[in-house]
């Protein structure tokens, strides 16, 4: 499928003086390297996004001289992957900064509409077992269906004097909770929590906690969380004060397995540079920042399901936990302690 994208002089459109068609951008004339460097993805993936989102984008831009879905998607990808409206991508497709902003908004909304299709826990028993098998092969922990963690994405201070977004390191952020499988595919992405909330507080209020609390069958599987999370029958955390060799072996296996979600955060932030703070914080309201983060999560899953490597763009530094203290309360749930001890005895003794 060849895309010949007619580029419009959007500044003329903005001022109502008509429009003109500039030189066509023919995606077939550029290399995958050019597309990767400019828009972050190869041509076949861009073709797929156009087909996936074009109906939604056409609904949002029903003006006779609206920017085409093709250009909107390229503009949004350029922003997500560069973190700037002033990147070389602007020259590549010839639209103004104001038009880019509208394109990013339109594509972000279109991607969020698609979120239920690409992010979610499976109900298929065979797929659940596949998840468990893949996690088991990492370090020998059975029955794991997902790993959960939070990380902070920096945002500008809200217009209102709202301290709820100030985290323990003193900057404004959104605390994002992700759950992923062993491949880094997101099963849940809650990207709207104020930065002042601890990981434990986010988890307690999250849809994931409600989902697992309501499950009727204890054999559905476990999540793995670090010591910032509460120990539950369905949420296994490390032993905070290991005593036996089995405890140490379990903790090592837990750390190795749980690292998948941290790697996923790093890969997302590195592929989508608008989230990593290198070119400044996200300059939008908390709600719009949340939407942009969610859109990047959807793109992450779409790319993974399309065969792209989740770890291609992974950086090495740790994700930002914003100085949160480790939760010392291992004794909240005696039944959860029993379940974890049985796990350790049966598989790590």
UniProtKB/Swiss-Prot annotation:
Q: What class of enzyme is it?
A: hydrolase
Entry GO terms, CC: cytoplasm; nucleus
For this UniProt entry, the molecular function terms from Gene Ontology, in alphabetical order, are: metal ion binding; nuclease activity
Which taxonomic lineage does the organism of this UniProt entry have?
Eukaryota, Metazoa, Chordata, Craniata, Vertebrata
- Family recorded in the similarity comment: Belongs to the HARBI1 family.
- Its predominant location is nucleus
Question: Record's InterPro entries?
Answer: HARBI1-like, HARBI1_animal, HARBI1_dom
Key word Protein transport present = no
Cofactor names from the entry are: a divalent metal cation
Span of domain DDE Tnp4: 148-301
EC no.? 3.1.-.-
Binding-site positions, a divalent metal cation: 149, 199, 226, 262
User: Per its database record, what is this protein's job?
Assistant: Transposase-derived protein that may have nuclease activity (Potential). Does not have transposase activity.
**What protein does this entry describe?**
Putative nuclease HARBI1
Keywords tagged on the record: Cytoplasm, Hydrolase, Metal-binding, Nuclease, Nucleus
- State the compartments where it is located: Nucleus; Cytoplasm
């Amino acid at each position: 499928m060849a895309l010949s994208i007619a580029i419009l002089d959007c500044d003329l459109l903005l001022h109502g003086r008509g429009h003109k068609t500039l030189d066509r951008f023919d995606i077939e004339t550029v290399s995958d390297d050019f597309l990767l460097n400019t828009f972050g993805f190869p041509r076949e993936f861009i073709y797929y996004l156009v087909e996936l989102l074009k109906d939604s984008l056409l609904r949002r831009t029903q003006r006779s001289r609206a920017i085409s879905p093709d250009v909107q998607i390229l503009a949004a990808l350029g922003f997500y992957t560069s973190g700037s409206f002033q990147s070389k991508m602007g020259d590549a497709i010839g639209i103004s900064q104001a038009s880019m902003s509208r394109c990013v908004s339109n594509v972000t909304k279109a991607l969020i509409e698609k979120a239920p299709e690409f992010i979610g826990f499976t109900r298929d028993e065979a797929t659940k077992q596949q998840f468990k098998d893949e996690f088991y092969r990492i370090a020998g922990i059975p029955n794991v269906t997902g790993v959960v963690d939070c990380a902070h994405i920096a945002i500008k201070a809200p217009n209102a004097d709202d301290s709820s977004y100030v985290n323990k390191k003193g900057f404004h952020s959104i605390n994002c909770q992700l759950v992923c499988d062993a491949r880094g595919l997101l099963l849940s992405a809650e990207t709207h929590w104020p930065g002042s909330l601890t990981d434990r507080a986010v988890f307690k209020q999250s849809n994931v906690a409600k989902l697992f609390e309501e499950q009727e069958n204890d054999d559905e599987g476990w999540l793995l969380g670090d010591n910032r999370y509460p120990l539950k029958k369905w949420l296994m955390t490390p032993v905070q004060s290991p005593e036996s060799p089995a405890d140490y072996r379990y903790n090592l296996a837990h750390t190795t397995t749980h690292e998948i979600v941290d790697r996923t955060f790093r890969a997302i932030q590195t592929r989508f540079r608008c989230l990593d703070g290198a070119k400044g914080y996200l300059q939008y309201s908390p709600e719009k920042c949340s939407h942009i983060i969610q859109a990047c999560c959807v793109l992450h899953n779409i790319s993974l399901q399309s065969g792209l490597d989740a770890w291609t763009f992974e950086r090495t530094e740790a994700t930002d936990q914003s100085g949160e203290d480790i939760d010392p309360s291992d004794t909240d749930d005696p039944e959860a302690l029993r379940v974890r001890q049985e796990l350790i005895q049966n598989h790590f003794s």
